[in-house]
Design a protein with these regions (language model features):
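Glycine-rich beta-alpha loop elements in corrinoid/cobalamin-binding modules
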Residues: 2-125, 365-413, 421-435
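Short secondary-structure boundary/capping segments
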Residues: 27, 61-66, 82-84, 182, ...
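Local cysteine-cluster metal-coordination motifs and their immediate loop/turn environment
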Residues: 166-182, 495-510
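N-terminal pre-triad scaffold of radical SAM enzymes
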Residues: 153-177, 203, 244, 357-359
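Conserved SAM/AdoMet-binding glycine-rich loop
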Residues: 9, 18, 201-352, 356, ...
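N-terminal [4Fe-4S]-dependent radical SAM core
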Residues: 108, 114, 118-164, 475-487, ...
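Radical SAM enzyme core and accessory elements
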Residues: 389-522
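Flexible glycine/acidic-rich beta-alpha junction loops that bind and position SAM and/or redox cofactors
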Residues: 58, 112-116, 222, 252-256, ...
Length: 522
């Protein structure tokens, strides 16, 4: 199947750095020149957005327009401008210059980048009237956010084969490795009435019998219990199950448990992220081991026999003792099952321990930190394996090679564009799939282009270094990120936004939990 080359604005959502080659491959297959400078006319304007637009520089040569932030409104404004410019016979350059004046629009071609002798960025200079700082767009009233409730349901089975309903955007917690928890600040909730109406429409129009209430931390929705009550008024009779895929360890209560198992028990997944309390303090997870064990005991008493635990290895200051503690925490959950008098009779427990590799991301307190080398990550993965002593625990881990390439592109600059161009010419695609990925071939590309990938993945940055994304504003100040990074090295936690305003900068938007908390403190 080929794209049609006459599509006016081919647009891409970039959720994952290893999907960059897929975007270029789609353009190539459509007959559209992959480089922006080779597309001269006002057609085939390539647009991209999503989380990876936080650092657009590694693909700046290929994309005409990036949407910075949330796209529900800015996309309509750019489309309307595009129609107007075409009707008036304006050039592509004129359209791009006008687009750059829309808040949330970044046009890479309107900026020049210079570099120091050591390869770091020396300056980032806008051309003409292009803004020096690109500010993100934000949807302040989530009840007015467009949400599709009638769409084509795939004929084949897909990974997330269920209806998905966003209940709020942002996160109050502030985990120091988490990019989404920063770039989607402040927290903004949909009303229970809007959520209920949209969930009902989703099920009526698609035939799905499961609704997943989606957010970064669903149990942090301020009206979660009234919402579940409202949903259960119709979902129970219609045999529609409600799942909360993103649960805090300290947010899973008896009340919530009983409300989400009325039709069928969905899987339970918790993310302690680190095995030791010291490491959980470093990353500001603010979860204690006794809270996790109590939560799991509650689930076991409610009939659950399987639990998934998500962890991360390679975090700043991590030691091998911290790594071994991951296996130890998994064992403690197994022990909690057999100590629970109300556990299901005659059934065994299954605990899945999954460990991803830390990838430093832009706009996080750890954006200056190096990633562990691949051999060190392999050593830590093996250490967890060796520390597990029971068959009740299944251990899964992410491929360290793909995590390395992810780290390269997550914090890369425009010098990586020539690598991406060559990768497209050589047919690289589906790099997020192990059967299509070869780190050896990627390393050959880097070497051929004279680019050192470890410069991006394994190098510690100083706080005063100009970063490739410093010209972009996601609402949270660099001073706040620096403070949080320093607190991590002091093993010091920060309270969440509903307890205390930590002056991250997001209150400037004038809405959301951050603003309300700050207003009440003044």
């Amino acid at each position: 199947m080929r794209l049609k080359a006459e599509i006016p604005c081919p647009s891409f959502t970039l959720q994952y750095e290893l999907s960059f080659t897929n975007m270029l491959n789609m353009l190539r297959l459509s007959g559209v020149p992959i480089k922006s400078c080779d597309r001269k006319e006002l057609k085939n304007i390539v647009v991209a957005g999503g989380p990876c637009a936080c650092n657009p520089e590694p693909i700046a040569d290929f994309v005409d327009i990036f949407f910075i932030g949330e796209g529900e409104e800015v996309d309509l404004e750019v489309i309307e401008l595009f129609r107007k410019c075409r009707a008036e016979g304006k050039s592509k350059q004129e359209f791009l210059e006008l687009s750059s004046k829309i808040e949330g629009v970044y046009v890479p071609a309107l900026y020049d980048v210079t570099y120091n002798e050591d390869g770091t960025i020396k300056s980032f200079t806008p051309k003409g009237d292009a803004p020096a700082k690109i500010h993100k767009r934000i949807m302040l009233d989530m009840d007015k956010s467009f949400y599709p409730d009638n769409f084509v349901v795939p004929l084949v089975e897909i990974v997330h084969d269920r209806a998905v309903q966003e209940i709020f955007r942002g996160c109050i917690r502030g985990c120091r490795f988490c990019q989404a928890g920063i770039i989607y600040r402040p927290v903004r909730e949909k009303s229970p009435e809007t959520i209920n109406k949209q969930c009902r429409a989703l099920c009526d129009n698609t035939g799905y019998d499961e609704v997943s209430l989606s957010s970064l931390s669903s149990s942090d929705y301020s009206q979660i219990v009234p919402l579940l009550d409202k949903l259960n008024e119709w979902s129970k009779d219609e045999k529609v199950s409600i799942s909360l895929p993103s649960l805090r360890v300290d947010g899973f209560t008896d009340d919530i448990m009983n409300k989400i198992k009325t039709v069928r028990k969905s899987g339970l997944t918790f993310a302690p992220e680190a095995g030791s309390q010291r490491m959980r303090d470093v990353i500001n997870k603010n979860v204690r081991e006794d809270e996790l064990l109590q939560t799991c005991t509650t689930a076991f008493a409610g009939g659950w026999t399987t639990v998934k635990l998500y962890f991360m290895i390679g975090l700043p200051t991590e030691t091998m003792d911290d790594v071994a503690a991951i296996a130890g925490l998994g064992q403690s959950v197994v022990d909690a099952y057999y100590k629970c008098p109300e556990k299901p009779k005659g059934k065994s427990v299954r605990v899945t321990v999954s460990a991803s590799s830390f990838v430093p991301k832009p706009f996080t307190p750890f954006q200056w930190e190096p990633q562990d080398t691949i051999p060190v990550l392999h050593e830590k993965q093996q250490h967890i394996k060796d520390s597990i002593t029971t068959r009740k625990i299944q251990f899964n881990y992410h491929d360290a090679d793909t995590s390395y390439l992810e780290a390269v592109f997550a914090r890369g600059d425009r010098k990586l564009c020539k690598v991406m161009e060559l990768a497209c010419e050589r047919g690289f695609h589906f790099d997020g799939w192990n059967d299509c990925f070869s780190l050896e071939k990627w390393l050959e590309l880097f070497d051929e282009c004279g680019v050192d990938p470890s410069f991006y993945a394994n190098r510690h940055r100083s706080f005063d270094e100009i970063l490739p994304w410093d010209h972009i504003d996601y609402g949270v100040t660099k001073d706040f990120l620096i403070r949080e990074c320093k607190k991590a090295y002091a093993d010091t936690t920060t309270p969440h936004c509903r307890l205390k305003c930590n002056n991250c900068g997001a209150a400037k938007y004038g809405k959301g939990v951050c603003f309300e908390k700050r207003k009440n403190m003044v």
